[in-house]
Amino acid sequence: MKSTVYHPYHLVDPSPWPYVGACGALFITVGSVVYFHYSQTWVLLMGAITLSLTMIVWWRDVIREATFQGLHTMVVKQGLKYGMLLFILSEVLFFFSFFWAFFHSSIAPNIELGAVWPPQGINPLNPFSVPLLNTAVLLSSGATVTWAHHALISGKKTEAINGLTITVVLGLIFTGLQAMEYYEAPFAISDSVYGSTFFVATGFHGMHVIIGTTFLAVCLARLVYHQFTRHHHLGFEAASWYWHFVDVVWLFLYICIYWWGS
C-alpha cells in the first residue's frame, strides 16, 4: 500500500525497545545493589546483556529507517544533530561533577588526609610514563578521525576507510594501556578519596572510550558496505563529535588529575 506524506517529520512505528531497554537498566541498577551486598553477579549480568542487545537491535532499526527506507529527511537529521549535541552537553556536566569532587578534596585537603595532597601513603602514577603515551595515542586518534571525515566529504572512500581503521586501532591501544595502568597501579579505589576520584573519573572515561571505539567500528563497517556518502553520513559525524569530546575530557583528566594532582 502506497501512502503520501505531507510533512518532513518521521512518525516512528510502535517499538518494544524503549520498554525492554528500561527493564535492562532496572536490572543493572538492582543487580549493582545485589552485587555490592551479596557478591551475586547474575542480575547485573542479565541487565547488561539485555541493555546491550536492546541497543544493537534499536540502532539497527534506526539504520534501516535512515539508509533503506529514506525516512530521515533534512528536518529529521537536524533534530538528530541537536539530540547528539544535547547528549554531549549532558556528558560534559557528568564529568564536571567528577572534577568538582576532585578539586573539592585536593585544593583544601582535610586533616584526615594529613592536610596534604596526594594523601599520605598514596604513591601517584608518573604522569610522564603511560599517561603521556595514552595522551599521544588519543590525540593521534582525533587527528585520524578528522582525516577520515574530510576524506569522506571529498569522496575519497579508501582514505576514509584507512583513517577510520587507524582510529579504531588507536582506541583499542588506549584501552589496553589503560587496563595495564590499572593493573599496575600502587593504589586502589578504596585508598582514600584520591583513589576513589581517580578511578571513578578515569574509569568512566575509559568506558566512554570503549563506547566511542564501538561507535566508530560500526561506522567503519557501514562505510565498507557503502552506507555512507559524501552528503549523507550523519552517523559518522555524530561518532566523530563524540570522539572529539572523549579527547577533550582526557586532556582535562591528564592535566588536572595525572599532572597537577600528583
UniProtKB/Swiss-Prot annotation:
Catalytic activity, EC: 7.1.1.9
PROSITE patterns (UniProt xref): COX3 (PS50253)
GO-annotated cellular components: mitochondrial inner membrane
InterPro entries in UniProt: Cyt_c/ubiquinol_Oxase_su3, Cyt_c_oxase_su3_dom, Cyt_c_oxidase-like_su3, Cyt_c_oxidase_su3-like_sf, Cyt_c_oxidase_su3_a-hlx
Keyword match Iron-sulfur: no
GO molecular function: cytochrome-c oxidase activity
Principal location: mitochondrion
GO biological process terms held by the UniProt record: mitochondrial electron transport, cytochrome c to oxygen
Membrane-protein topology: Multi-pass membrane protein
Function of the molecule: Component of the cytochrome c oxidase, the last enzyme in the mitochondrial electron transport chain which drives oxidative phosphorylation. The respiratory chain contains 3 multisubunit complexes succinate dehydrogenase (complex II, CII), ubiquinol-cytochrome c oxidoreductase (cytochrome b-c1 complex, complex III, CIII) and cytochrome c oxidase (complex IV, CIV), that cooperate to transfer electrons derived from NADH and succinate to molecular oxygen, creating an electrochemical gradient over the inner membrane that drives transmembrane transport and the ATP synthase.
Family: Belongs to the cytochrome c oxidase subunit 3 family.
Protein name (Swiss-Prot/TrEMBL): Cytochrome c oxidase subunit 3
Biological source species: Metridium senile
